[in-house]
Amino acid sequence: MSMDSDAKSPFQTAELAFDDPFAAFSQWMEDARGAEPNDPNAMTLATASPSGVPSARIVLLRSVDAAEHPERGFVFFTNTESRKGVEIAANPQVALLFHWKSLGRQIRIEGKAIPVAVEEAESYFHTRPRISRLGARASDQSRPLPDRKTLQKRVEEEEARYPGDDIPRPAYWSGYRVTPTVIEFWQQMPFRLHDRLVFRRQGKNWGQEKLYP
């Protein structure tokens, strides 16, 4: 049986067709929230040192800016003195990757990581669970830790210092906004003949093209 007559042919499935990558992202994220059992907003963040040594880790997307935002992008929060924060300070070019296995979809983003405003970091920090806020103060993220008891002791010390809910945000805890220059949508298809649609920023607009799988 030829592929053209196969009921599972990738060419019998509607292909990706979007005009607005942010609108498409929002729709795919909504689909993922209904399909993924855990953390549909989880994304791989890739950074690189000034000498080009890459590193990657999973972080959580916290917001996507509305169209009127002057630096519209994808926002996450972290310790800015961690490895990723140090690398972003030296080289703000980063990549993000969302993968939703249940949907057979990926979105890949390239762009520049820009620190969020202090007010934005403050606002989000105070929505976090109390122990998470204490942990942010207690952890020297990415630095050597002698043992778990040391971390436990530091958290307990912060808890004693701030017994109530008024826990100040440490200056090194903030966020970044990734302003994209490239957004690629990938849809799994049979026989590895996947569908890829990439948007590239062209001034205030977006150009788009298909890519071979």
Swiss-Prot record:
UniProt biased composition (Basic and acidic residues): 145-163
UniProt keyword Glycoprotein, yes or no: no
GO annotation terms (biological process): pyridoxine biosynthetic process
Root EC class: oxidoreductase
Residues binding FMN: 57-62, 77-78, 83-84, 106, 141-142, 186, 196
Keywords: Flavoprotein, FMN, Oxidoreductase, Pyridoxine biosynthesis
The keyword Flavoprotein is assigned to this record: yes
Cofactor, free-text remark: Binds 1 FMN per subunit.
Reactions it catalyzes: pyridoxamine 5'-phosphate + O2 + H2O = pyridoxal 5'-phosphate + H2O2 + NH4(+); pyridoxine 5'-phosphate + O2 = pyridoxal 5'-phosphate + H2O2
PROSITE patterns, A to Z: PYRIDOX_OXIDASE
UniProt-listed Pfam families: PNP_phzG_C, PNPOx_N
Pathway annotation from the record: Cofactor metabolism; pyridoxal 5'-phosphate salvage; pyridoxal 5'-phosphate from pyridoxamine 5'-phosphate: step 1/1; Cofactor metabolism; pyridoxal 5'-phosphate salvage; pyridoxal 5'-phosphate from pyridoxine 5'-phosphate: step 1/1
Positions of the UniProt region annotated as Disordered: 135-163
Residues that hold substrate according to the record: R62, Y124, R128, S132, R192, L193, H194
Essential cofactor(s): FMN
InterPro entries named among the record's database cross-references: Pyridox_Oxase, Pyridox_Oxase_CS, Pyridox_Oxase_N, Pyridoxamine_oxidase_dimer_C, Split_barrel_FMN-bd
Single GO molecular function: pyridoxamine phosphate oxidase activity
EC number: 1.4.3.5
PANTHER family named in the record: PYRIDOXINE-5'-PHOSPHATE OXIDASE, PYRIDOXINE-5-PHOSPHATE OXIDASE
Self-association state and partner proteins as the record states: Homodimer.
Functional note: Catalyzes the oxidation of either pyridoxine 5'-phosphate (PNP) or pyridoxamine 5'-phosphate (PMP) into pyridoxal 5'-phosphate (PLP).
Family: Belongs to the pyridoxamine 5'-phosphate oxidase family.
Protein name: Pyridoxine/pyridoxamine 5'-phosphate oxidase
GN (gene name): pdxH
